[in-house]
Regions:
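Generic signature of intrinsically disordered, low-complexity segments enriched in small/polar residues
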Residues: 6, 19, 35, 43, ...
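Ser/Thr-rich, low-complexity intrinsically disordered terminal regions
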Residues: 16-17, 21-66, 81
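Terminal, regulation- and interaction-focused segments at domain boundaries
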Residues: 1-30, 112
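A near-ubiquitous, low-amplitude feature marking generic local secondary-structure context
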Residues: 6-10, 43, 54, 82-85, ...
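C-terminal basic regulatory modules in eukaryotic proteins
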Residues: 61-116
Length: 116
């Protein structure tokens, strides 16, 4: 998946972009790890509870120039993008709540912003 100026997970109605106020230390504070190439990568499990092993992972990667990003929710193998927004079960609702928690943290710390 190439880097783009805006990104959204499969099925999401909200599009995000890198905030112009982004700081490298803020990325590290929220859990981003700097890769060998200099990019910043965040991987967070979306399991609602430790006992539920859904295997879904939120992946956000920001380019080293802090201008572009990649974003996806992937399954256990880490390759196939998954849509957590189409299922209406209680379990899926808990997964969406955890996803929203992570995204709100990134918005509050000015790592990302919502595109109008």
């Amino acid at each position: 998946m190439p880097y783009t100026t805006t990104a959204k997970p499969l099925g999401s109605s909200v599009t995000y972009q890198v905030s112009p106020n982004i700081k490298r230390y803020a990325l590290r504070d929220v859990g981003f790890i700097e890769t060998k190439q200099g990019n910043f990568q965040l991987q967070r499990p979306l399991d609602p509870t430790p006992q539920m092993k859904t295997g879904l992972v939120l992946k956000v990667t920001i380019s080293k120039d802090l201008k572009q990003l990649k974003m996806s929710i992937v399954g256990q193998n880490g390759m196939k993008a998954m849509d957590i927004f189409k299922d209406e079960s209680e379990r899926a609702d808990m997964i969406r709540q955890k996803y929203q928690f992570y995204m709100n943290t990134l918005l509050q710390r000015e790592c990302l912003q919502i595109v109008d």
